């Protein structure tokens, strides 16, 4: 769920997720293609896109909402939630953003997707 993912990012990084990551590089935000621009784009967004693509099995496509909570500043995805795997993908990306704040480059914010060429590596 995009809203829940945004809340995870905000709490992990202290950054507003939509302007900060909504159109960053070649993979952050809607759709993704081309060669990732840096560790934030590659390790976080590219891996997140691949994770969500691979984890769509048990979660209804019409409703990808999931439950989660915080325990000692750690995201805990709902154990019996049918969308738990998607929650885990979002959690991993939010933590990745925090761990890679130092690689964030403002020049890739609002990056034109037309500049993103064919991907060098598949999921």
From Swiss-Prot:
Keyword Zinc found: no
SUPFAM superfamilies: Phospholipase A2, PLA2
SMART domains xref list: PA2c
Active site positions, chain numbering: 48, 90
One annotated Gene Ontology cellular component of this protein: extracellular region
Cofactor(s) the record lists: Ca(2+)
Note: Lys and Tyr residues play critical role in myotoxic, neurotoxic, and cytotoxic activities displayed by this toxin. In an other hand, His residues are relevant for edematogenic, neurotoxic, and myotoxic effects, but not for cytotoxic activity.
Protein name: Basic phospholipase A2 Ph-TX1
Organism of provenance: Bothrocophias hyoprora (Amazonian hognose viper)
């Amino acid at each position: 769920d995009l809203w829940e993912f945004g809340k995870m990012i905000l709490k992990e990084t202290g950054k507003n997720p939509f302007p900060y990551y909504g159109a960053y590089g070649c993979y952050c935000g809607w759709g993704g293609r081309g060669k990732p621009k840096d560790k934030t784009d590659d390790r976080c967004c590219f891996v997140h896109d691949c994770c969500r693509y691979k984890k769509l099995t048990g979660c209804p496509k019409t409703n990808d909402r999931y439950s989660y909570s915080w325990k000692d500043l750690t995201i805990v995805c709902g154990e019996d939630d049918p969308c738990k795997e998607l929650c885990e993908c979002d959690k991993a990306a939010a933590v990745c953003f925090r761990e890679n704040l130092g690689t964030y480059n403002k020049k890739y914010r609002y990056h034109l997707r037309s500049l993103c060429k064919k991907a060098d590596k598949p999921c």
